């Protein structure tokens, strides 16, 4: 009983700092509409239980002065400089691979007649059992798995905010085509035109790029939202889940 009481008192002493840091987490990843997603709450509960972000790595991020306070990584997942493409992932997969096909995508399966169904993140019964999951859970988020729980793939709200709040300039960095994004506060980051992988081919490098979000396109759940960019255009788009695209993560345990 004495041991239990000591633990209880220690836990109470820890609560104020835990709550303070939890508030920082929520401010860093709150959606534009003021709500926090279920997957964000999952990360937060994990933090509250452990009292820290044990696997967080100090990857560099930039404060663009965005209204939400979101901090974006300066490099893609798997890259060490802003102009490097980094690793290519299918949506909801956390390990890079050499070939991206319908058949080897983790969350699709086929019946004996060759019809394709979705095993996770599905909002329509035409595609199989419905789970109504519309955002990647942390264990399926390549940024979270590869960089630690302080990092996530961006939500659709964060993508839209980035598109609408920054000025975009098509340019080169060390010979690599891409967009220089300048935020409201004058800080900037570079998104290389990394192309995409389909099958074993790397397509359209230097011409355009797609960057995954963690948000499902719920009207057609075999598609998800991404950042699309080329020399003349940039916006949020929806695209098939099985392709190999790069990831620019957002920081979720720290704000400006």
Identify what each model region corresponds to.
Residues 24-56:
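Alpha-helical segments with a strong preference for the paired helices of cellulosomal dockerin domains
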Residues 18-22:
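Sec/Tat signal peptide C-region and signal peptidase I cleavage site
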Residues 8-17:
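Bacterial N-terminal signal peptides
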Residues 57-256:
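Conserved positions within compact, well-structured domain cores
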Residues 1-8:
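Bacterial N-terminal signal peptides that target proteins for export
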Residues 17, 52, 170-171:
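A short hydrophobic/aromatic micro-motif that marks alpha-helical segments and, especially, helix-coil
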């Amino acid at each position: 009983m004495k041991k239990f009481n000591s633990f209880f008192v220690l836990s109470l002493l820890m609560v104020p700092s835990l709550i303070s840091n939890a508030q920082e987490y929520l401010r860093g990843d709150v959606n534009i509409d003021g709500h926090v997603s279920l997957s964000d709450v999952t990360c937060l509960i994990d933090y509250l239980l452990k009292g820290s972000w044990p696997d967080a790595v100090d990857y560099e991020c930039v404060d663009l002065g965005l209204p939400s306070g979101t901090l974006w990584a300066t490099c893609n997942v798997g890259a060490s400089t802003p102009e490097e493409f980094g690793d290519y992932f299918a949506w909801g997969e956390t390990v890079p691979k050499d070939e991206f096909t319908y058949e080897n995508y983790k969350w699709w399966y086929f019946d004996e007649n060759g019809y394709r169904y979705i095993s996770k993140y599905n909002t329509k019964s035409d595609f199989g059992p419905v789970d109504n999951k519309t955002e990647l859970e942390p264990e399926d988020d390549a940024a979270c798995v590869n960089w630690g729980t302080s990092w996530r793939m961006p939500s659709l709200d964060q993508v839209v905010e980035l598109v609408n709040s920054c000025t975009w300039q098509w340019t080169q960095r060390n010979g690599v085509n891409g967009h220089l994004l300048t935020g409201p506060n004058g800080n900037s980051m570079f998104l290389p035109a990394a192309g995409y992988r389909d099958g074993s081919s790397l397509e359209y490098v230097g011409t355009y790029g797609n960057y995954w979000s963690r948000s499902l396109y719920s009207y057609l759940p075999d598609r998800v939202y991404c950042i699309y960019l080329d020399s003349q255009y940039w916006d949020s788009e929806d695209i098939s889940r099985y392709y190999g695209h790069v990831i620019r993560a957002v920081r979720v345990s720290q704000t400006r």
